[in-house]
Structure formats: C-alpha cells, structure tokens
Swiss-Prot record:
Belongs to the EF-Ts family. Associates with the EF-Tu.GDP complex and induces the exchange of GDP to GTP. It remains bound to the aminoacyl-tRNA.EF-Tu.GTP complex up to the GTP hydrolysis stage on the ribosome. GO terms for molecular function: translation elongation factor activity. The keyword RNA-binding does not apply. The lineage of its organism: Bacteria, Bacillati, Cyanobacteriota, Cyanophyceae, Synechococcales. It comes from Prochlorococcus marinus (strain MIT 9515). Keywords: Cytoplasm, Elongation factor, Protein biosynthesis. The keyword Protein biosynthesis applies. PROSITE patterns: EF_TS_1, EF_TS_2. This is Elongation factor Ts. It comes from the Bacteria. CDD domains: UBA_EF-Ts. GO terms for cellular component: cytoplasm. It is found in: Cytoplasm.
Amino acid sequence: MANITAKLVKDLRDKTGAGMMDCKKALNETDGNVEKALEWLRKKGIASAEKKSGRVAAEGSIGSYIHTGSRVGVLLELNCETDFVARGDIFQSLLKDVSMQVAACPNVEYVSIDEIPEDVVKKEKGIEMGRDDLSGKPENIKEKIVEGRIAKRLNELVLLSQPYIKDSSLTVEDLVKQAAAKIGENIKVRRFTRYTLGEGIEKNEMDFADEVASLKSN
C-alpha cells in the first residue's frame, strides 16, 4: 500500500476543491495515484460538488415518506439554490431517497457529525473509557482504541455517514454530492424528523382472561 502523505492529500485537495477526508479516501482507493484519485473523485461527483458547497442554499423542498404499513413516517428538508432546481426530477428523486434512508435508520439522530452536542461526545467517551477490555492497557493505547470506537459510534448517529440503502458502496453524503454535481448547485440536507407509530406511548398490556373479566364487571 502506498504511503499517503499529508502533502499528497493537500495537492489533491488543491486540484479538486474536495475535502481532506475525501481526498485521503480517494488516494487510498487508488494506491496513491493522484490522477486516478482525481478520476475517482469525479466519478463520485465529489470534485465538482465541493466547489459549490460554500454557496447559499435557501430554496428547496420539504418531503415526506410513509413506509409500507404506515408505521414509520419521515419529514425532511432538503435545500438548494434555486426554486427551478427544487422542482426538478433529480432534486425530487434525491429528496425521496434520503427520506427513505431516514425511515430505514432508526438510530440516526443528526444530519452531520458537526451537529452532535459536545455532551453526547463526552458521554460516549466516558462509556468507552470504562469498558472492562481496556483495563490494564497503557493510556496512549487506550486513547487510540477509544477514539476509534467513538468515531464509529458517532457515525452511527449521523445521516450523511450512513451507507446508502440502494448502494452500500456510497454514503448518503456521496449521494448528495453526486446530485449537486449533476445539477450544478449546492445541496444541503438541513433537518429531518422520524415518526414511529406508538412511540412513547405506554401500552396497557392485558391478557385475554383479564380482558374478559373486565368486560364482565362492566
């Protein structure tokens, strides 16, 4: 495996405008070949999408999705730059796909890593630091293990980090970037709400004999 240096990642980022993590992933996937990494980013729609990410996305649409059986529902706000794009097929298809993703991921609570409150991060770190399998390990080793576990746990809570349900080689973030590259506008998932039928309601469980007895007493 090629040695992916910080300079190599920076050079690719300067050429593409893509994020550091995307550049590093592209170089890992292409054994450190910059030209192939550039092609990889373009195929993913990342190279051109990143250049648009700083532009204001104040238009868009709120989509809804009701899963089969009507037991799970989702409302999701997806933003873009113009109303024209918001009404287009690519944008509306993305809105539906991301809404379906939320319905399929009951553990997801946040759009991106940046949204996770610091107290949640501290809580997860406290849980991991206290695990029995870390006892007796040197502090520096323990920190590295915990860091990896926390990153994995936090990504489980984030919508953009989820493997896309229709193609697990992509994340939801990849999907959004691909759509942005096709459309030529910045696209942002702003917020979502997931509803589960009966969630939070305490059910009064009663067996058949008790139910019959209660009916007789009325």
